[in-house]
């Protein structure tokens, strides 16, 4: 039976995955509506011409979410951990890069939650 620490780590992984599914939705399907509300620092006229670029970013967020969700269903505990560590590390790195190049908020909204979850995963099993 799994310990409570492992259950908390898995719940955190699912929450991080859901966040990235939400980002996918904004960037791929709602860039000109919800995207404008989310990315208020960008001028309104930029959304239509950058729709394709945003969709590409959304697709990458979908890959991150898919990897995290996949990690939950892997039967082998070591592989489950390895896959989760890989995808969480990708998100932490992207959060750091985003904070340096775009907005510090990216780290606090994406990188930090992934880093905390990564620590939880590393301390399980």
Where does each model-flagged region fall?
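Cytosolic, membrane-interface loops and tails of multi-pass inner-membrane proteins
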Residues: 28-50
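N-terminal signal-anchor transmembrane alpha helix
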Residues: 8-29
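Mid-chain, well-packed structural core segment of small domains
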Residues: 58-98
